[in-house]
């Protein structure tokens, strides 16, 4: 059972990830590895003249979104170690030199993978301001975030990466269970209360669902559920 904001959402889906659903007993670590591998390829292909490009994640330009991804990884590692991810001091990314982003990203990904090496972390209860769930579901939630931001960067820089269908499909299935299609403003108001001063002035993490056909590619359905128009 997962909780999101004031809502309680049952998670009992066990059908194919190609349809945008996920398995409760899936090990998300290979999916995390696949998502970060895709991200690494996209990040490495960004040119210097593209760093100021706007992205579909409207509060970030490409440069800022790259730094944001680096800053997310210590939270992923903290969850794997059993620490409170909201109390992690993220690396200083605001002024990170452009040439330092790729090595910092790669090092942070390896640290996160190592933190989840013990499979017992998948069964641990993880409490976040926006959800309470198993470690497996929480890690899969970050597969969703990493994939969506990878798409943001790819879209902003004219890249067409090959997506891992299993990773994207399971991430889409989870986020549909975690995040309702309506009432998001109210949900994030509750999340901000839980986050306290750290959330002051922050934009909604998810815009309203964008319309896409039911048979759209799974990556399009994932980003549309996260408020992007493919």
Q: At which residue positions do the language-model features occur?
A:
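Extended, alpha-helix-rich binding/interface surfaces that flank or overlap catalytic cores
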Residues: 65
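Arg/Lys-rich, alpha-helical DNA-contact motif
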Residues: 73
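Helical hydrophobic small-molecule/effector-binding pocket
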Residues: 111-123
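Structured surface interface patches that mediate subunit assembly and partner/cofactor docking
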Residues: 2-31, 35-38, 45-58, 78-90, ...
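Glycine-rich loop at the start of a catalytic domain that most often binds anionic cofactors/ligands
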Residues: 68-69
């Amino acid at each position: 059972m997962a909780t999101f904001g004031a809502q309680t959402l049952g998670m009992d889906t066990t059908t194919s990830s190609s349809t945008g659903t996920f398995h409760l007993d899936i090990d998300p670590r290979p999916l995390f590895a696949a998502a970060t591998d895709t991200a690494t390829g996209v990040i490495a292909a960004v040119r210097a003249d593209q760093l100021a490009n706007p992205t579909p994640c409207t509060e970030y330009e490409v440069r800022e979104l790259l730094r944001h991804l680096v800053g997310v990884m210590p939270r992923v590692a903290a969850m794997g170690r059993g620490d409170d991810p909201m109390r992690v001091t993220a690396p200083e990314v605001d002024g990170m030199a452009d040439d330092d982003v790729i090595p910092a990203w790669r090092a942070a990904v390896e640290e996160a993978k190592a933190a989840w090496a013990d499979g017992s972390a998948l069964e641990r209860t993880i409490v976040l301001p926006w959800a309470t769930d198993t470690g497996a579901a929480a890690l899969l939630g970050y597969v969703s975030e990493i994939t969506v931001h990878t798409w943001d960067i790819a879209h902003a820089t004219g890249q067409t990466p090959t997506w891992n269908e299993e990773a994207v499909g399971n991430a889409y299935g989870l986020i549909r269970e975690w995040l309702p299609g309506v009432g998001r403003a109210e949900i994030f108001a509750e999340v901000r209360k839980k986050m306290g001063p750290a959330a002051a002035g922050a934009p909604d993490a998810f815009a309203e669902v964008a319309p896409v056909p039911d048979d759209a590619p799974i990556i399009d359905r994932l980003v549309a559920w996260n408020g992007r128009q493919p």
